Curated annotation (Swiss-Prot):
It comes from Halalkalibacterium halodurans (strain ATCC BAA-125 / DSM 18197 / FERM 7344 / JCM 9153 / C-125) (Bacillus halodurans). SUPFAM superfamilies: Sigma3 and sigma4 domains of RNA polymerase sigma factors. Belongs to the UPF0122 family. Gene3D superfamilies: Winged helix-like DNA-binding domain superfamily/Winged helix DNA-binding domain. It holds the Pfam family UPF0122. InterPro entries: RNA_pol_sigma_r3/r4-like, UPF0122, UPF0122_fam_protein, WH-like_DNA-bd_sf. Might take part in the signal recognition particle (SRP) pathway. This is inferred from the conservation of its genetic proximity to ftsY/ffh. May be a regulatory protein. This is UPF0122 protein BH2485. Signal peptide: none annotated.
Length: 109
């Protein structure tokens, strides 16, 4: 399992277009630019609690999107299969082994 920050960054990458502008800004500042809650609150002239609440709600939304759409899970699975393919090519695997890996890529939903 990815650590929380890395996971949120990935989820944000996949689903940011589904967020409001304010949610995108808060998440970007917090996770990508490493701003503190206080710095974000000062930037937007709101309370730290308002920023915290917004970020927590947005995190929950991102997790919900992932639960329904599984874009990150599919990306991770594709990456895993591609790594296996690279290793198979390096060790000069049989064409059957390579085809099996390619088919597993092809059948990913």
């Amino acid at each position: 399992m990815l650590d929380k920050t890395l996971r949120m960054n990935y989820l944000f990458d996949f689903y940011q277009s589904l967020l409001t502008e304010k949610q995108r800004k808060y998440m970007s500042l917090y996770y990508l630019d490493d701003f503190s809650l206080g710095e974000i609150a000062e930037e937007f002239d709101v309370s730290r609690q308002a920023v915290y609440d917004n970020i927590k709600r947005t995190e929950a939304m991102l997790e919900e999107y992932e639960e329904k759409l599984s874009l990150l899970a599919k990306f991770e699975k594709r990456s895993e299969i591609l790594q296996q393919l690279k290793e198979a090519v390096d060790k000069q695997a049989t064409s059957e082994e390579l085809m099996a890996l390619l088919e597993s890529l092809d059948t990913l939903e």
